[in-house]
Structure formats: C-alpha cells, structure tokens
Design a protein with these regions (language model features):
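RNA-contacting regions in translation and RNA-metabolism proteins
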Residues: 1-143, 147-168
Length: 168
C-alpha cells in the first residue's frame, strides 16, 4: 500500500513528540508548527479514503477559520473535494485542497474557485519590484466576499510576490 509522503516522520506527527530531525525542520521554518495537526488529520484520513493513499504533501496554511492544503499527485476534482470535505469535518473548519505543479494560473483558479480568472498580469513598479494583478469578473466578487485579503496573503506567501486582486 502506497502512502502520502510527508516532510516529517509519521511517528513524530502521530505522537506529537518530534525527533531531532523533525524538530530541526520545524525550528528552521521548513515546516510550520501549525502544519502538524493538519498532517495528522490527513494521515488519519488515509485509512478511510483510498483516494489519499498516493502523492506528496507539499504545504498547508491555517488561516484560523480556513485551512488550505497543497498536495502533489494524480487526483481528480472529485477526489480533492472529497478529501477537503473529510478534512473539514476532522479539523472543524473549512478546508481547500489544491494540486501543486500545474502553474500559477491553475493554482489560483483552484484557490479562487468558483470565481473565474480573466487573466494574470505582471506589473513592474518604479522601485524595481513586481506586482501580480489577478483580474476577476465583477459578478464573481460575491465568491470572495470577506476572503480577498486572506487569499491575497496566501498567494503572496507561495509566490513570494506582491499580489493585487481587481474586479473588472
């Protein structure tokens, strides 16, 4: 049976006691301490969901009321939605599961779904920095109501660039 690969040892995550190697990864910032409960929930889900038995765990982000998990593998939309639903019920908060490795636009489409992305532009500022502008139809603003800043911070964290979301 194949299992999802995690950056920390399974025993450390399940027990909550980190070995020196895992402790180093947490202290260096490679893995955030907030990711450990999310990894634990995913490991528990592997026993119930056969969809979750392959692939790699990349990263997760906890925004208080919502969790965003990035996985790498060959899952379809239905499987990702099923994983997200089960993870939501285990963690007691909303969860989104995204696939990594399909490009910036695809990652943003998954994150901002059901909002449609009209385009992504790069804006070079006079100080030499870059800003990505994500253009979304005005009619889809309702899907991001109250979450614009959260998604902007999330995308900025992943890409290492300043992000602006505009509605046209």
């Amino acid at each position: 049976m194949f299992l999802v690969k995690y950056p920390l040892d399974r025993i450390c995550v399940k027990s909550g006691v980190l070995c020196p190697n895992c402790q180093r990864k947490v202290e260096s910032g490679e893995v955030a301490r907030e990711e450990i409960p999310i990894m634990k929930a995913l490991m528990e889900l592997e026993e119930d969901l056969k969809e979750l038995r392959t692939g790699n765990y990349i990263k997760s982000f906890d925004f208080g009321d919502e969790v965003i998990v990035i996985l790498k593998g060959d899952w379809d939309k239905v499987s990702l939605d099923k994983i997200a639903k089960e993870l939501s019920s285990r963690l007691g908060k909303s969860a989104k599961v995204l696939l990594e490795g399909e490009g910036v636009k695809k990652l943003m489409e998954q994150l901002l779904y059901p909002a449609t992305i009209l385009g992504i532009n790069t804006l070079w500022l006079p100080d030499g920095s870059e800003q990505m502008v994500v253009r979304i139809p005005r009619r889809d603003r309702k899907y991001l109501k109250g979450k614009e800043e959260k998604y902007r911070r999330f995308i900025s964290t992943i890409l290492g660039k300043d992000i602006k979301i505009t509605f046209e």
